[in-house]
Amino acid sequence: MEKPKIQEVIAVEGRYDKNALLQVVDASVLELGGFGIFNDREKTALLRRLAETRGIILFTDPDGAGFVIRNRLKGAIPTGRVLHAYVPDVYGKEKRKRRAGKEGKLGVEGMPPEVLLSALRAAGATFEGEGATVKENPVTHADLLDLGLIGAGSRTKRAALLRALALPEHLSTAALLDVLGTLTTREELVEECNKIVANRE
């Protein structure tokens, strides 16, 4: 089976993440070297250039460290096309490791191929030979407020939504809004929230 080809460059934390992705897609994958990216000015400059020319997809682990790396890079790459791919919170350990990570979550390398592909599609990756899909009625900040996903008393409902959409728990409001913009429409989000409310009753 031929692997789908992606236009953007995918930036991952390490070599095992890179290997996992290259088994699923035909793409340029750049290793960040974990926290080492913070001191690597040349690689950061390369990421800026790639964001301007081809676009990049930040694909870090769903743990706290992955979000620190993602957020630091988001600030370091102010312009260009920067997409964010997320894998769900799945607890366990990768086969090559003796024990689970600090938070006990699987990283990019531990995810099944279909989860990786789904995360890339949800991020808005450009797949060669496929037309771009534009969602009508995108989700807005006001929608999140109206649906009780942000603001006072929103924690439980928001956590349930993140689980239902297979998104990591560390997602900020801005990141959630970005993801929902490519993943769902306003109507689909309302429907999902209604299911969550029905399941709690």
Residue spans for each PLM region:
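Acidic, glycine-rich catalytic loops of TOPRIM or P-loop NTPase phosphate-binding modules used
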Residues: E8-V9, R15-N19, Q23-T53
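A short, flexible N-terminal coil/short beta segment enriched in small residues
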Residues: M1-I10
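Acidic beta-strand-to-loop metal/phosphate-binding motif
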Residues: A11-E13, A51-A65, Y86
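C-terminal, charge/polar-rich interaction regions
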Residues: S118-R121, A125, E130-E201
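Long, charge-dense
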Residues: G75-T126
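Short Gly/Thr/Asp-enriched flexible loops that form oxyanion-binding sites at enzyme active sites
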Residues: V68-A76
